[in-house]
Amino acid sequence: DNTTEFAKSICPLSNLKNIIEAECELHDVGKLREKFQTDMLDVLRLGDDAHKGGIDHSTAGGRLMRELMGENEFSDLLSLLIYSHHGLNDCISLDNGKTLNEIRDDNDIEYELVKSRLFELYGEDYIKELLAKAKEDFDRIDMQVKKYVKDHKKGYGSRYFFMGMYFRLLLSMLIDSDW
């Protein structure tokens, strides 16, 4: 996948490469939806007269991530990266108080079809192994950040600050690579 290879090539930190590969491989999984495929065929057939855009193609990747990895900080980070690759989302709706995950879980995205098509293309074992490697790297980074914050006490930022910087870097590389 071009997005994956480009993102890995511009990554300045080798310990992020597995996380980058996981986010890139899953960010457009929703394009396997029947509705998305039909929309793309209409664009080819009708050109400028076709309906363009507006079809959710990021929810499936984030939802799959959370299903396979469970609810934890890693799955929260990676699903938010995937959900946000075309613009940041509020994590809590001010309208109804629902979390981003609850909102995304309510979306009708042909999830089971997308999941079966993805596993048919890549293999379920490959996806699970990819996520396991990314989780190992996340855990290693998190331990390093915790140690750094503990060793340096005040004045150098909190764990949330440093993990937020990793998030920003990961999101930037995904966005820069997805063109």
What is the predicted role of each segment?
Residues 1-179:
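Accessory nucleic-acid engagement/destabilization modules that flank
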